[in-house]
Amino acid sequence: MDTTESAESAHNPARPPSRSRCPPSAQPGSEGFWRPWVRTPGEKEKRTGPRAAEALPSGPGMAEASGKLLQYQHPVRLFWPKSKCYDYLYQEAETLLKNFPIQATISFYEDSDSEDEIEGLACENQSN
Protein backbone atom coordinates (compact mmCIF):
# COMPACT_ATOMS: atom_id res chain seq x y z
CA MET A 1 0.00 0.00 0.00
CA ASP A 2 1.55 3.32 -0.98
CA THR A 3 1.31 6.56 1.03
CA THR A 4 -1.56 8.06 -1.01
CA GLU A 5 -3.62 4.90 -0.54
CA SER A 6 -3.00 4.84 3.23
CA ALA A 7 -3.85 8.54 3.49
CA GLU A 8 -7.11 8.00 1.57
CA SER A 9 -8.18 5.05 3.70
CA ALA A 10 -7.38 7.00 6.87
CA HIS A 11 -9.57 9.91 5.73
CA ASN A 12 -12.32 7.78 4.18
CA PRO A 13 -13.72 5.35 6.76
CA ALA A 14 -16.14 3.86 4.18
CA ARG A 15 -13.23 2.48 2.16
CA PRO A 16 -11.64 -0.59 3.75
CA PRO A 17 -7.84 -0.86 3.74
CA SER A 18 -6.41 -2.96 0.95
CA ARG A 19 -5.51 -6.56 1.80
CA SER A 20 -2.17 -8.20 1.28
CA ARG A 21 -1.72 -10.07 -1.96
CA CYS A 22 0.20 -13.06 -0.67
CA PRO A 23 -1.02 -16.53 -1.64
CA PRO A 24 -3.30 -18.34 0.85
CA SER A 25 -0.60 -20.84 1.85
CA ALA A 26 1.80 -18.02 2.72
CA GLN A 27 -0.62 -16.06 4.89
CA PRO A 28 0.44 -15.82 8.51
CA GLY A 29 -1.51 -18.09 10.84
CA SER A 30 -2.46 -20.66 8.18
CA GLU A 31 0.21 -23.05 9.42
CA GLY A 32 -1.79 -23.55 12.63
CA PHE A 33 -4.57 -25.53 10.96
CA TRP A 34 -4.45 -29.31 11.33
CA ARG A 35 -4.76 -31.24 8.09
CA PRO A 36 -4.88 -35.03 8.64
CA TRP A 37 -3.39 -35.78 5.23
CA VAL A 38 -0.27 -33.67 5.90
CA ARG A 39 2.21 -35.31 8.26
CA THR A 40 4.13 -33.12 10.65
CA PRO A 41 7.83 -33.76 11.32
CA GLY A 42 6.90 -35.07 14.78
CA GLU A 43 4.58 -37.71 13.29
CA LYS A 44 7.29 -38.92 10.93
CA GLU A 45 9.65 -39.39 13.88
CA LYS A 46 6.97 -41.28 15.82
CA ARG A 47 6.41 -43.76 13.00
CA THR A 48 10.08 -44.34 12.25
CA GLY A 49 11.42 -44.12 15.79
CA PRO A 50 12.93 -47.01 17.76
CA ARG A 51 9.64 -47.67 19.55
CA ALA A 52 7.75 -48.34 16.28
CA ALA A 53 8.66 -52.04 16.44
CA GLU A 54 7.42 -52.23 20.05
CA ALA A 55 4.13 -50.58 19.18
CA LEU A 56 3.48 -53.05 16.36
CA PRO A 57 4.83 -56.41 17.52
CA SER A 58 2.67 -58.38 15.10
CA GLY A 59 3.45 -56.16 12.12
CA PRO A 60 1.72 -53.18 10.56
CA GLY A 61 -2.01 -53.43 10.06
CA MET A 62 -2.55 -56.24 12.56
CA ALA A 63 -5.55 -56.06 14.87
CA GLU A 64 -5.16 -55.07 18.48
CA ALA A 65 -7.33 -56.25 21.40
CA SER A 66 -10.25 -54.00 20.40
CA GLY A 67 -10.32 -55.59 16.95
CA LYS A 68 -9.54 -52.40 15.04
CA LEU A 69 -6.54 -52.08 12.78
CA LEU A 70 -3.69 -50.02 14.16
CA GLN A 71 -2.50 -47.92 11.22
CA TYR A 72 -4.18 -46.34 8.24
CA GLN A 73 -2.90 -44.19 5.44
CA HIS A 74 -5.50 -41.42 5.25
CA PRO A 75 -7.71 -40.78 3.41
CA VAL A 76 -9.07 -44.32 3.67
CA ARG A 77 -11.21 -45.68 0.83
CA LEU A 78 -13.25 -48.84 1.26
CA PHE A 79 -14.24 -50.51 -1.99
CA TRP A 80 -17.66 -52.17 -1.91
CA PRO A 81 -19.43 -53.91 -4.82
CA LYS A 82 -22.55 -52.16 -6.08
CA SER A 83 -24.48 -55.43 -5.94
CA LYS A 84 -24.06 -55.42 -2.16
CA CYS A 85 -24.83 -51.77 -1.49
CA TYR A 86 -28.05 -52.69 0.32
CA ASP A 87 -26.20 -55.28 2.39
CA TYR A 88 -24.00 -52.43 3.57
CA LEU A 89 -26.94 -50.21 4.34
CA TYR A 90 -28.88 -52.77 6.32
CA GLN A 91 -27.01 -55.91 7.37
CA GLU A 92 -23.28 -55.39 7.46
CA ALA A 93 -23.04 -51.70 8.36
CA GLU A 94 -22.45 -52.33 12.04
CA THR A 95 -19.65 -54.81 11.36
CA LEU A 96 -18.07 -52.51 8.79
CA LEU A 97 -18.06 -49.54 11.15
CA LYS A 98 -16.61 -51.62 13.99
CA ASN A 99 -13.65 -52.68 11.85
CA PHE A 100 -12.92 -49.42 10.03
CA PRO A 101 -12.67 -45.80 11.10
CA ILE A 102 -15.61 -43.52 10.55
CA GLN A 103 -13.43 -41.22 8.45
CA ALA A 104 -13.45 -43.72 5.59
CA THR A 105 -15.04 -43.18 2.21
CA ILE A 106 -17.02 -46.06 0.76
CA SER A 107 -16.50 -46.28 -2.99
CA PHE A 108 -18.86 -48.53 -4.91
CA TYR A 109 -17.53 -50.39 -7.93
CA GLU A 110 -19.14 -52.40 -10.71
CA ASP A 111 -18.65 -56.06 -9.95
CA SER A 112 -18.99 -58.53 -12.80
CA ASP A 113 -19.84 -61.42 -10.50
CA SER A 114 -23.05 -59.97 -9.13
CA GLU A 115 -25.77 -62.31 -7.88
CA ASP A 116 -28.11 -61.39 -10.76
CA GLU A 117 -25.57 -62.44 -13.37
CA ILE A 118 -24.82 -65.68 -11.53
CA GLU A 119 -28.53 -66.52 -11.31
CA GLY A 120 -28.94 -65.70 -15.01
CA LEU A 121 -26.08 -68.01 -15.95
CA ALA A 122 -27.49 -70.78 -13.76
CA CYS A 123 -30.88 -70.50 -15.49
CA GLU A 124 -29.22 -70.61 -18.94
CA ASN A 125 -27.24 -73.72 -17.99
CA GLN A 126 -30.35 -75.51 -16.71
CA SER A 127 -32.34 -74.77 -19.88
CA ASN A 128 -29.56 -76.16 -22.14
UniProtKB/Swiss-Prot annotation:
Record's protein name: Protein ripply2
Role this protein plays: Plays a role in somitogenesis. Required for somite segregation and establishment of rostrocaudal polarity in somites.
Subcellular location: Nucleus
Location of the region described as Disordered in the Swiss-Prot/TrEMBL record: 1-64
UniProt xrefs under InterPro entries: Ripply_fam
Record family assignment: Belongs to the ripply family.
Keyword Nucleus: yes
GO cellular component: nucleoplasm; nucleus
Domain of life per record: Eukaryota
Record region (Ripply homology domain): 74-109
Tissues in which the UniProt entry reports expression: Expressed in the embryonic anterior presomitic mesoderm. First expressed in S-I at 8.5 dpc, where expression is maintained until 13.5 dpc, with an additional stripe of expression sometimes seen in the rostral part of S0 and S-I.
Chief localisation class: nucleus
Residue span of motif WRPW motif: 34-37
Organism expressing this protein natively: Mus musculus (Mouse)
Nucleus among keywords: yes
Composition-biased stretches (Low complexity): 17-28
PANTHER family given in the database record: PROTEIN RIPPLY-LIKE, PROTEIN RIPPLY2
Pfam families hit by this protein: Ripply
Conditions for induction: By MESP2, and acts in a negative feedback loop with MESP2, functioning negatively toward MESP2 to regulate NOTCH signaling in the anterior presomitic mesoderm.
Alphabetical keyword list: Developmental protein, Nucleus
Gene: Ripply2
